[in-house]
UniProtKB/Swiss-Prot annotation:
InterPro entries: Calcineurin-like_PHP_ApaH, Metallo-depent_PP-like. Gene3D superfamilies: 3.60.21.10. Transmembrane segments: none annotated. GO terms for molecular function: hydrolase activity. This is Uncharacterized protein L509. It comes from Acanthamoeba polyphaga mimivirus.
Length: 280
């Protein structure tokens, strides 16, 4: 059996010692079935690539899994301490860090072919409408803590930046969908759907169903949720859920901050082989 475990929003930047966090320990300290192959999807907000904690985490998990698919989240780019760095600096550090571990595959608008299945990875971001842009740019930390180089100066990113990245990500996914001859599992940080009270499908806590900030967390990609996609795994909303949409598994498994109770399950997984059989 090929087992794909999936987690997100570990926020190692706020954890002093990963060895003392039992939920994290279960990601590397568990009994493996010798007949199974284990993969791990890290769906963003894992940690700051300039901190020691994420490298120590990688040292723990790298020997355990055959492949680890790592999609950066928005928090990977946060400037919490000086010296402040641009998003390009963070991307370079992410690339260099992952290159130290041959089985950790950094995926941001990338595709990985694994035998009879393909994985697409993308931070994804989201599209912020003009009507919500003023509120979201003030209330969401991305627009205060993520920096870019503009005219040789370090400055805050804008709604226009994240909207552009979102368009690029969706275009990349659409292009891969057109060319794919294999079933696809898509891995993103931002959610592919908004919560739906009528269907009872929640990609975030139902208490946020009418939040003015929803566009910073969700996309409405319902029109592209078709074959050959067989599963879409994501993070970002600090909520854990799993449901079927148009025959596709939509699932998330998020740890979140220490004061939150998000029903995180370090053993959550998808059976890749069974998923392929179900989609014959």
């Amino acid at each position: 059996m090929r087992i794909l475990r999936y987690v997100s929003d570990l926020h190692l930047e706020y954890i002093d010692c990963i060895d003392g966090k039992s939920a994290l320990n279960s990601l590397w300290d568990f009994k493996k079935d010798p007949n199974d192959i284990y993969y791990l999807a890290l769906l963003g907000d894992i940690g700051n690539p300039f901190d020691k904690s994420i490298k120590k985490f990688f040292q723990k998990i790298s020997p355990i899994y055959d492949k680890i698919f790592y999609v950066p989240g928005n928090h990977e780019y946060y400037n919490l301490n000086k010296p402040y760095r641009s998003i390009d600096d963070f991307n370079s550090q992410l690339k260099n860090m992952c290159q130290e571990f041959p089985n950790i595959i950094l995926m941001n608008n990338e595709i990985y072919e694994l035998d009879d299945i393909s994985f697409i990875g993308s931070t994804l971001w989201s599209n912020i409408s003009e009507s919500k842009s003023n509120h979201i740019s003030k209330s969401i930390n991305d627009y205060h803590l993520i920096k870019k180089i503009d005219n040789n100066k370090l400055t805050k990113i804008t709604i226009d930046d994240t909207n552009k990245w979102n368009t690029e990500s969706i275009d990349y996914i659409l292009n891969q969908l057109k060319n794919s001859i294999k079933p696809l599992i898509i891995l993103t940080h931002h959610a592919p759907l908004f919560s739906d009270n009528i269907l009872g499908n929640y990609t975030a806590d139902p208490c946020y169903i009418n939040s003015l900030n929803n566009e910073a967390f969700h996309n409405d990609l319902s029109k592209i949720l078709n074959q050959p996609i067989i599963a879409w795994l994501y993070g970002h909303t600090h909520y854990t859920s799993k449901f079927i949409y148009n025959g596709i598994i939509i699932a998330t498994n998020q740890l979140g901050y220490s004061h939150e109770r998000n029903n995180f399950n370090p053993y959550a997984y998808i059976d890749i082989d069974q998923l392929l059989i179900d989609n014959l």
